[in-house]
Amino acid sequence: MSIFSLLPELWLLGLVCALFVASISDKKQSVASWLPMAAGLGVLAALFALGERGEFLYAAYKLDGLSQFFKLLIAFGFAVVTGIAAGNKEGKDLTPDYFMLLALSAWGLMLLASCVELITLYLALELSSYSLYALIPLRGQDRRAAEAGIKYILFGAAVTALALFGLSYIIAAKHTTYLSGLAATSWSFADAPMAVIGLTLFLAGFFYKLALFPFHFWCPDVYQGAKNETAAYVATIPKLGAVVVLVRLAAFVAPHLEVTTILAILGAVSMTAGNLAALVQRDLKRLLGFSSVAHAGYVMLGLAAGSAAGMSAAAFYSLAYILMNLAAFYVVCAIAKNDENPSLDDLDGLYKRAPALAMILAVAAFSLVGLPPTAGFAGKLFLLSAAWDQGYHWLVIVAVLNTAISIYYYLSMVRHAYTGESDAPAIVWPRGYLIFGGALAVLVLLLGILPAPLYDLAAQAAGQLHP
C-alpha cells in the first residue's frame, strides 16, 4: 500500500489549495476555463484507485470496495457540477472561492466514505457541511439565499446535537466507536436498549443530509434560495456521503429489528410526504426539493432490507439518482434568466426554443419516475426486489403507489416543455455545453439499458460488508 492509494483525496485536496491560492491572488482571474478539466482528472484518479485496499489512522480510515466506489461517484458528481457552473453564462462570473468551497465540501465527503470509526465519521461529516454553510447564502442581494443559509445552519446545528447525544449513548453501551466492533454485538432493543436509542439518534445526522422525513424541512427552502449551481450540488453530492455511511451502519443491523423497522417506516412516510408536497409546486427547484425527500424514502428500501442485495441496490440507486438529478438541474440552470428560479411555466415551448434541452429534461423526468429504459427504473427494480425478498411487502406496495403519484408532477414538466406555447426567444448555448448535457442524458439511458457492470461493482462492495 502506497500514498497513491489516497490519490482521489490528495488530488481534491490539491485542487482546494490551488483554488485557495487563486482566491487570495491579486489577479482575480476566472477559473472556469481550467477547473472542469481539473475536476475530470479527479475522476480518472478515482478510477485509478478503485481497486486499492488498506487502512490508515489506526484502522479508523479504511479503503475498501464501498469507499472507492463512492469516491468515484463523488468525483464524478463534482466534475459534473463544476462543468455546469463553469459552462453557464452566470457561472463564468463565479469567483475562485466559490469553487474552493465546493471542492472542500466534496473532499470532506470523500473522507467520509472511508471513515469506519464514529468520531472520525462525525468530523468528516462536519467538514463537508461547514463549507456549505458559507456557500448557500452566496447569491448576491437575494434575501431568500440568506434565509436558506440560516435555515440550513439552524437545522444542521440541531441535528448535530442529536447525533452527538446518540454517539455518547453508543459509546456508553458498547465501549467502542469502531464499526467492526459494533458489528460484532447485538443490536436488538431487548439486549441493548441504550445502544439502539443512540444509533437512532446518531443516524439523524445522516437523515438530515439525505433530506429524509422528518429531517427534510430545510430541503425545499434551501434549493429555492441557493444559486442554481449550488442547488445542483446540494441536491446530489452530499446525498452520496449520507448513503455510504448509512450503508455501513445498516449492514450490521439484521432485518426486522427495531432500527430497520424505523428505517422502513421513515422511508414510507418520506416517500408519501415528498410526493404529495411536490404535486402543488410551481417553482422547479422547490419541486425537485420535495422530489429529493421522496427519493430518500426509496433509498430506505435497500437499507431496511439489510441484505447484501439491499446494500448493493442502495449504492446503485445513489448513482442513478445523481445522474438523473444532475440532468434535471442542468436544464434548470440552462433556462434560468439572470440566475432567477425558473417555474414550470418557463418550460413552455421548450421543444421549439431548445429541442436538446427538452430532450434532456424528458430523459431526466422519465428516470425520476422510474420508467424503462432509464437508470431510475433499474435502480427502483433492484430496491423493490431486495425489500420484497426480505418480507417488506407492505413497503414495496407503498413505494409502487408513490411512484404512481410521482408520475403527475414529473410528467407535468415534460407536458409543459412539449405542449405548452411561449413567445420567449430561442435559448442559444455553445455546442460543447449542449453536448455535455446530452452526455448526461445518454448515461441515464445507458445505465438503464446496461446496469449489470456498475451493479456488479456495487455488489462486490456490499459483499465485503456481508461476507
From Swiss-Prot:
GO molecular function terms attached to this record: NADH dehydrogenase (ubiquinone) activity; NADH:ubiquinone reductase (non-electrogenic) activity; quinone binding
Subcellular location: Cell inner membrane
Signal peptide start and end residues: none
Principal location: membrane
Cross-referenced InterPro entries: NADH-Q_OxRdtase_suN/2, ND/Mrp_TM
Documented EC number(s): 7.1.1.-
4Fe-4S among keywords: no
Keywords on record: Cell inner membrane, Cell membrane, Membrane, NAD, Quinone, Translocase, Transmembrane, Transmembrane helix, Transport, Ubiquinone
Keyword Coiled coil among UniProt keywords: no
Topology in the lipid bilayer: Multi-pass membrane protein
Oligomer and partners: NDH-1 is composed of 14 different subunits. Subunits NuoA, H, J, K, L, M, N constitute the membrane sector of the complex.
Job description of the protein: NDH-1 shuttles electrons from NADH, via FMN and iron-sulfur (Fe-S) centers, to quinones in the respiratory chain. The immediate electron acceptor for the enzyme in this species is believed to be ubiquinone. Couples the redox reaction to proton translocation (for every two electrons transferred, four hydrogen ions are translocated across the cytoplasmic membrane), and thus conserves the redox energy in a proton gradient.
Family: Belongs to the complex I subunit 2 family.
Protein name: NADH-quinone oxidoreductase subunit N 2
Originating organism: Solidesulfovibrio magneticus (strain ATCC 700980 / DSM 13731 / RS-1)
Underlying gene: nuoN2
